[in-house]
């Protein structure tokens, strides 16, 4: 499986809520981070492999994902970049919004060794605030 296919498989597993499958694609020393200033969203911050399930748990506990569409994906030998349209409704506030996500994936020996995700942090803060 190539790197783009691996990222697509991760996205399919995310859509199915299958964190165990996602974990199988990660190297033991993965450096995982949803990069953002502040801590308004519980999925923000850097994580080790052991902490990655908490990233997905925080999303599942707080959001109903209403749209997840890969708009563009490109790769070189080690990296995959993806642009995603993401729609969400925050369970606690009932507020909904849509944004563009940017994901950078780096691979070594077929495993994810680095993930960086960015999102519209201002919109996220607005949606999470009652």
PLM feature spans:
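A solvent-exposed, acidic/Ser-Thr-rich amphipathic alpha-helical stretch
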Residues: 21, 27-77
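Short, flexible active-site loop motifs that bind/organize anionic cofactors or intermediates
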Residues: 9-12, 42, 114
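Short, charged low-complexity linear motifs
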Residues: 17-20, 41, 89-92
